[in-house]
Amino acid sequence: MAAQTTEKLDQLDLNVQAAPTADQVPAEAEEDSDDAQDEGAAEAGAAGAGSTLADKKKKKKKPKKKSKKKGGAKVQSEPPRVPVSNLFPNGQYPEGEIVEYLNDNAYRTTNEEKRYLDRMNNDFLQEYRQGAEVHRQVRQYAQKNIKPGQTLTEIAEGIEDSVRALTGHSGLEEGDNIKGGMGFPCGLSINHCAAHYTPNAGNKMVLNEGDVMKVDFGAHLNGRIVDSAFTMTFDPVYDPLLAAVKDATNTGIREAGIDVRMSDIGAAIQEAMESYEVEINGTMHPVKCIRNLNGHNIDQHVIHGGKSVPIVKSTDQTKMEEGEVFAIETFGSTGKGYVREEMETSHYALAADAPNVPLRLSSAKNLLNLINKNFGTLPFCRRYIDRLGQDKYLLGLNNLVSSGIVQDYPPLCDIKGSYTAQYEHVCFYFGVFSTLIVY
């Protein structure tokens, strides 16, 4: 999911066709050639007519029609609805952007034993790559088609329906969403709201021309969550803000790696981010890191795995380890650079250390059963409960939250009037390709 506070811890070208080979000459050219040969044969036949059977006029050959290949190249629809497994029938998905290890980690490129052990992780990586391809195609469509005037509900449901279609998991059958689909709700946080906002049922909020919207969503296969985010604006005045945060995220990706300390990553991110400023309505604003938001590691079916990647200088001496998956994300703000919980809650998840407490409300018991069977430890929102046909569940949900069984994640906001931006990618730290793999 998009963010973790310290307090709580171009479009793929699928249309490429093979270049024409010599036997793929246009039908018209073939017919002209055959016609010329047949005319010559007819003249020779006339000169020796009646002599022998071999001298008889040759029959005019009909040009063979080239049989068309069945199926053709499969392409993605608009909106995206073709499962990526249909687009990549061999099950081999793009690797993503690769960044070579440097310095002391360069040995991973040549170590034969490391390469052998890494190949054993191929199934694990293919699940991540499939989810990454889903995310790439959906976000590319979203970036082209999100426009001012659309409601947030329309935008969120459009993204979520696309993810479900491309993973091949609608999430309507019991347990289906645990197998694949949405890794967490689609966050659409606007302006001073930095993270964890998605519309609840009945929300009428509309995206405006002057808004700065963070789009943060996850796709997963078998619990391998691909968590990536970007920021959309429609006014170039905000370009320096977006450039600052994008630069900071890319810096974090470059600095991260096996055995690197979190404090070093955070210091590099802060230096990159806070070298920018943005002018809004005649006032210069320094871009600040939102110091109580962090990146995080990701475990199977668990979006926040327990480790945090700070985006400011810190004393955290924790190291990244081989085999870990991290969401490297940064947040920049024109405000105070500190977020608090505000607005109506929409995001929830089963608490990792949920207590075993008796539930007296039948609505709470029924809802907990539904959550366990349909979401497990994956985050969900109220709209996801709605689409499963549930109603009048809010009392039970609040009871689960107050009992500590379900954790709520309210929207995280800087001061009103400020603007925030976010960029995020998932990174894998394996000797598997002796690289850092960025989605």
From Swiss-Prot:
Keyword Metal-binding included in the entry's annotation: yes
Superkingdom field: Eukaryota
Binding site for a divalent metal cation 1: D216, D227, E424
Compartments, as annotated in UniProt: Cytoplasm
Main location: cytoplasm
InterPro entries attached to this UniProt entry: Creatinase/aminopeptidase-like, Met_Aminopeptidase_Type2, Pept_M24, Pept_M24_MAP, Pept_M24A_MAP2, Pept_M24A_MAP2_BS, WH-like_DNA-bd_sf, WH_DNA-bd_sf
Binding of substrate, residues: H196, H304
EC numbers, comma separated: 3.4.11.18
Compositionally biased intervals (Basic residues): 56-72
Residues the entry annotates as binding a divalent metal cation 2: D227, H296, E329, E424
Catalytic activity as recorded in UniProt: Release of N-terminal amino acids, preferentially methionine, from peptides and arylamides
Keywords assigned: Aminopeptidase, Cytoplasm, Hydrolase, Metal-binding, Protease
Function statement: Cotranslationally removes the N-terminal methionine from nascent proteins. The N-terminal methionine is often cleaved when the second residue in the primary sequence is small and uncharged (Met-Ala-, Cys, Gly, Pro, Ser, Thr, or Val).
Designated name of the protein: Methionine aminopeptidase 2-2
